[in-house]
């Protein structure tokens, strides 16, 4: 019975995303695509999808071995591929990356997929200001730095910026997630502003409010392991469809119904939560 319920939940709440391979090849073949968080999970799935249609890749992540393997795979498919292993939280390394990106012949797409998730209550983080520094540096500052660096190139090509956010940011703040949600919401707002300001330049900005995706990072939380989730490849398809379309954002259909309701009942939920911890 439980398996049947899970299968039904996957079917209803995580419908299989489809992407037109012909359209994908038309839009991405020969284009330069920058992907952060490219060594694993969604970023790696995105890179594999794009190399199969002939895109040129600039891959950024911390894991050098995995990045090099992806670059070798792309080059074996006659794609140009560059890998850059660094920590985007390191400001000097980020500055160096930005300088190198300025040397690219062109940039057509920037997929900002690198991210860090921390679940810790604020009272337990009084000696851990670095939790907030790390999430803001990676989830917010690195996105802004790369986008500002590549804006001139994106203007020349009519390029697109796609940011991987979380559907949880559409709901009332949840206890334990202050560092993560604050950093993701900051980037959501920045992208909304950039979308308004950059559209006259011909540059598209998109935000993907993804639901749970089965990756190494998300599955580190034992509470998520038995829940329905998209695969990394499913999430990559969602990002690609968003990049090829005209919508500012993607969000699951069910969040359009449940998020407004959650905000209505948020005061009541907070009340009972506060009572439960007294």
Per-range role (PLM):
Residues 166:
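Residue(s) in the substrate-gating loop at a strand-loop-helix junction
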Residues 117-133, 176:
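Conserved mid-core segment of classical short-chain dehydrogenase/reductases
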Residues 147, 183:
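Active-site helix of classical SDR
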Residues 32, 39-40:
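Conserved glycine-rich cofactor-binding loop
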Residues 207, 223-259:
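C-terminal helical subdomain
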Residues 53-70:
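Conserved glycine-rich Rossmann-like NAD(P)H-binding loop of the short-chain dehydrogenase/reductase
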Residues 1-32, 273-278:
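Non-catalytic terminal and boundary segments that flank Rossmann-like NAD(P)-dependent oxidoreductase
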């Amino acid at each position: 019975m439980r398996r049947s319920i899970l299968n039904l939940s996957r079917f209803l709440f995580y419908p299989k995303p489809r992407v037109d391979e012909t359209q994908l090849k038309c839009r991405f073949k020969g284009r330069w695509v920058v992907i952060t968080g490219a060594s694993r999970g969604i970023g790696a799935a995105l890179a594999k999808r794009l190399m199969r249609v002939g895109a040129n890749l600039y891959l950024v992540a911390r894991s050098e071995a995995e990045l090099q393997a992806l670059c070798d795979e792309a080059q074996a498919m006659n794609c140009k591929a560059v890998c850059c292993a660094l920590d985007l939280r390191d400001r000097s390394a980020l500055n160096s990356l930005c300088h190198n990106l300025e040397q690219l012949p062109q940039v057509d797409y920037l997929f900002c997929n690198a991210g860090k998730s921390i679940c810790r209550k604020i009272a337990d983080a009084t000696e851990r200001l670095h939790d907030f520094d790390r999430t803001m540096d990676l989830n917010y500052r690195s996105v802004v730095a790369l986008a500002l660096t590549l804006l001139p190139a994106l203007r020349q090509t009519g390029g697109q910026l796609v940011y991987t956010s979380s559907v949880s940011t559409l709901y009332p703040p949840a206890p334990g997630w202050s560092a993560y949600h604050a950093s993701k919401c900051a980037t959501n707002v920045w992208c909304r502003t950039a979308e308004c300001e950059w559209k006259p330049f011909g540059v598209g900005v998109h935000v993907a409010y993804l639901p749970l995706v089965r990756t190494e990072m998300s599955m580190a939380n034992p509470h998520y392991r038995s829940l329905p989730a998209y695969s990394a490849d499913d999430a990559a398809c969602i990002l690609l469809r968003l990049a090829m379309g005209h919508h500012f954002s993607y969000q699951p259909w069910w969040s359009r119904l449940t998020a407004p309701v959650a905000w209505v009942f948020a005061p009541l939920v907070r009340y009972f939560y506060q009572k439960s911890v007294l």
